[in-house]
């Protein structure tokens, strides 16, 4: 049962990124002109806490939830990150919805960490302006707009 390995995947030019929903795992792959796929880097923000039973993977209660939203351009990768204990979602689904936005260089270095006022699952990077758009649905759905430079300057 590999449903625990679900997450978000986006591409930008010849690179694609994967961010795990249930673990703090983020990676980048590049695709060559010959269509060879090469792992460029991978990061694990925190070690997963799980049990492995033959072909099954089960998260333990003290495992921290991972990434929900993912977007990238030619310089940066942005993700919404939960970091909450996964068991909280069993009691209240929205308890693990991210309140942190992380920015990484395309080389995988953390370059910004921003505390969000509202829980936000989805993130989109504008193609035309240096802005990020986040969707939050706490009481009703709203789109919040952030300047990319503000996120990159932020350090929690």
Task: Identify what each model region corresponds to.
Residues 1-3, 38-62, 117-118:
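Surface-exposed loop and turn segments in beta-propeller and other repeat-based domains
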Residues 79-96, 142-146:
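Short, conserved, GDST-rich strand-edge loop motifs in beta-rich repeat architectures
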């Amino acid at each position: 049962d590999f449903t625990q390995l679900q997450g978000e995947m986006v591409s930008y030019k010849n690179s694609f990124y994967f961010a795990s929903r249930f673990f703090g795992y983020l990676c980048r792959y590049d695709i060559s002109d010959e269509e060879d796929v090469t792992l460029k880097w991978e990061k694990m923000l925190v070690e997963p806490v799980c049990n492995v039973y033959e072909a099954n993977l089960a998260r333990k209660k003290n495992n921290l939830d991972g990434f929900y939203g993912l977007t990238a351009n030619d310089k940066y990768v942005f993700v919404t990150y939960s970091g909450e204990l996964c068991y909280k979602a069993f009691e209240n689904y929205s308890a693990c919805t991210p309140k942190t936005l992380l920015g990484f260089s395309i080389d995988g270095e953390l370059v910004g960490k921003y505390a969000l006022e509202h829980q936000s699952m989805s993130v989109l990077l504008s193609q035309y302006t240096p802005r990020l758009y986040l969707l939050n649905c706490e009481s009703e759905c709203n789109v919040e707009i952030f300047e990319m430079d503000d996120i990159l300057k932020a350090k929690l």
